[in-house]
Amino acid sequence: GYFAFEVVKDAARDLSEGRIPAGIPDSILENVKMDREVNGDLWKADLGRVERGKGWANLFDIDVELVRVNGQVWTMQAPSGRFFEKNMRADVTNPRGTMTEGALLFHYRAPAASWEQKTNYLVFPKGFEASGDLGAFEAGYMTLIPGGIMEADKGATVKWFDREEKTQ
C-alpha cells in the first residue's frame, strides 16, 4: 500500500512539474498512416493507435504493406507492437499476412517479428509458418533479407504439394 502511494505521489509530482515519468506516453495518436521508402523498399503502415513516449512508441492495430524492390508484396497485420527510436527497431506480436510474387500467394503467421532499419531485415525469432497452393514452410527462426531471400534456422520443413493438371 505505502509503496504504491509513493509511486503515485512521485508520478503526480513529475506531471505537475511538466515532466512525464518514464514509461508513460506523452502523446496518443489514432488512425496514423505512414508511407516510407527504406533502401528501395516501399513501406505503408496504418496504425489504429500510437502511444508515444520519450524514445519509444506502443503500436496497436497494425496493418503494413511492404513492396520489395524485387516485386514481392508482403502484408502484415498484428494486434500490437513497440518501436524503439534509439536503434530504429520495431517488434510486433502475432503477425500474420500474405506474400505475393506474380501469381504466387502464401499466407503466413508467427508468434513475433522484429525489424531494424540498419539491416532492413525482418526477423521471426520464435518461428514462422507459411502455406499456399504450392506447399507449406515452417521454421524455428526465419529471417527475410532484402531481395526476398528467406533464411531459415533452428529446424525447417518444406512440403511441396502435387499440382497435377486434370483434363476432361
Regions picked out by a protein language model, each given a short descriptive name:
Residues 1-168:
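Mature-chain termini and adjacent capping regions
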